[in-house]
Structures are given as structure tokens and as C-alpha cells.
Amino acid sequence: KKSAVVYKGKTATVKATLAGVSSVTYKSSNTKIATVNSKTGTVKGIKAGTVTITATSGKLKATYKLTVKNPTFSLTKSSATIKKGKTTTIKSKAAPAGKVTYTSSNKKVATVTSKGVVKGIKKGKATITVKCNGITKKFVVTVK
């Protein structure tokens, strides 16, 4: 592999293949952006940026470019109006894909399932707090 991507706070393992070699040492060109386990090659993204990971064994050397990206999370829309007894589904995009959690500010007005399905209970407004990748978004639901 000549390049790889890892997200901030996440780890990945990229193995260097040096012909006929069993003992390889790994090094990062900038440990403020990404660290690498010198024996296993497991990299961890520290902050957004690009580094060169070098694998060496004796006189043999291989390098690859590692890009560290900040995780992203967004909602396709931030509000909806529904009738009492009806539902709407909160749709989101996350990179990397991760567990999304939903919490209703007022369960007497609107409830939300673990899959993001919001149900109108009675007239009013509720804010659904949606979290993923350490990022929080708000979805306002108005029940008519």
C-alpha cells in the first residue's frame, strides 16, 4: 500500500511487505499527527494532517503516506413537522461510520427509537439530540 487513511482517535494496521524479511520497524514522520507502534505497524490518528510511515529492516525500506482526517457527522435535515401519531426518520451521514444515539428533550411530545424513528405523541416541540463520532447535532420536531 502506498497510502492509507485513518480518522482522529482511531487506529488501523498497515503491514509493510519487505521481501524475505520477518523483523520490520515502523516510524512516523510526525507523531503530533499520527503515532505508529514500532513493532506492529498499528497507527493511531492524533490530529488531521498527513505523515509518512516508514518501515525498515536492515537496509530495506518501504514508505507510505498516511492521511489523518477529522471524523464528520451531519444530519440530512435539522427539523421536521409531523402530526400526532405519525413518524419521521432522522437520516444522518458519518465518517467513519459509528454508533448513533438519539435522545428526546420531551418524551411527552415526541419519542425517538435507537434507529432514529421519531413519533409525535402530542402537540408541541421537542429537540432530538443526535450523537456520533463525538459530534452532537440537534433535530427539532414540531408535532401538530
Identify the role of each PLM range.
Residues 1-144:
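Extracytoplasmic soluble-region selector
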